[in-house]
């Protein structure tokens, strides 16, 4: 299995266009040791030819241009993307669908009922695409027991589970959570049995998750915030990290503590907010992650399982 990180930042990217926090300001001025990052998305393949795209960020065109296998150039119109799996309906995970509207071939989109509802009502991107390329929508089972496959992506099997998290702010049921608003996915390579667990919007470790995470050779999870009060402390938001569906890395029950329970797996944080000190490669927080064997995803990162 080849996992390629197209984008590793949370919504807004890094640096964020309107932000002058120490990280964003420092990156622009070249006074901190850090890498620019686009908004989070990965693609996965078992054969290096047919790729499944997870989420479509607003930066998707740049991300495709920077990863050659997604444009193999076999015909006058071509793509290496054979299917798109949407983890949720968040703006930073779905806006890129509009950038993929060209062509006569329908987009093969895999999503839950709740995500489909949001993308045909509150933010009707799929309705818009029907006037361009069109969409073949495939349902994703979320009970953790029934797997699904993506046509034309041989050698891969996917098992999804519902995660406790918040629907997007635009969603008609923003304050009435439903199973399927956000999912985590166990990705299995049927050729060698290797597995990866991908959950960029993991707000809470629920009882049904350890059984899936224990199977994974690689765990890629929510790296949005370092502390629960990160945005509060900077005066940027009136809510805590957990209030908006993100489990911070530090503190009791935080993501570091969770990942410590899976020492045999490769552990990677993705979907990192521009305020998070782990973006600074020489920060004390980054040193602590390294000490624990936890990696920080970056654009262009390749994981081979």
Curated annotation (Swiss-Prot):
The keyword Iron does not apply. It comes from the Bacteria. It comes from Methylobacillus flagellatus. The lineage of its organism: Bacteria, Pseudomonadati, Pseudomonadota, Betaproteobacteria, Nitrosomonadales. Belongs to the PqqB family. This is Coenzyme PQQ synthesis protein B. The gene is pqqB. Pathway: Cofactor biosynthesis; pyrroloquinoline quinone biosynthesis. Keywords: PQQ biosynthesis, Transport. Signal peptide: none annotated. Pfam families: Lactamase_B_2. May be involved in the transport of PQQ or its precursor to the periplasm. Gene3D superfamilies: Ribonuclease Z/Hydroxyacylglutathione hydrolase-like (3.60.15.10). One of its GO terms (biological process) is pyrroloquinoline quinone biosynthetic process. PANTHER family: COENZYME PQQ SYNTHESIS PROTEIN B, HYDROLASE C777.06C-RELATED-RELATED.
């Amino acid at each position: 299995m080849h996992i390629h990180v197209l984008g590793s930042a949370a919504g807004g990217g890094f640096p964020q266009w309107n932000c002058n926090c120490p990280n964003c300001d420092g990156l622009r001025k070249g006074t901190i040791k850090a890498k620019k990052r686009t908004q989070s998305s990965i693609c996965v393949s078992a054969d290096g030819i047919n790729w499944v795209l997870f989420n479509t960020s607003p930066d998707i065109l740049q991300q495709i241009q920077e990863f050659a296998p997604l444009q193999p150039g076999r015909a006058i119109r071509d793509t290496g993307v054979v299917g798109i799996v949407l983890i949720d309906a968040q703006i930073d995970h779905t806006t890129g669908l509009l950038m993929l509207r060209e062509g006569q071939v329908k987009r093969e989109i895999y999503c839950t009922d709740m995500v489909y509802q949001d993308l045909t009502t509150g933010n009707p991107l799929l309705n818009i695409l029907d006037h361009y390329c069109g969409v073949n929508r495939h349902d994703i089972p979320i009970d953790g027991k029934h797997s699904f496959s993506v046509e034309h992506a041989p050698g891969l099997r996917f098992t999804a589970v519902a995660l406790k998290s918040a629907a997007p702010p635009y969603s008609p049921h923003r304050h009435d959570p439903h199973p399927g608003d956000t999912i985590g996915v166990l990705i299995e390579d049927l050729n060698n049995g290797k597995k990866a667990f991908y959950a960029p919007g993991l707000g809470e470790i629920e009882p049904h998750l350890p059984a899936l995470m224990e199977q994974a050779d690689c765990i890629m999870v929510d790296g949005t915030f370092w502390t629960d009060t990160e945005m509060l402390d900077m005066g940027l938001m009136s809510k805590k990290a957990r209030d908006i569906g993100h489990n911070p890395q530090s503190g009791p029950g935080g993501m570091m503590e969770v990942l410590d329970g899976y020492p045999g797996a490769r552990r990677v944080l993705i979907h990192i907010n521009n305020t998070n000190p782990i973006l600074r490669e020489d920060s004390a927080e980054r040193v602590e992650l390294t000490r624990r064997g936890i990696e920080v995803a970056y654009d262009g990162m390749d994981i081979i399982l």
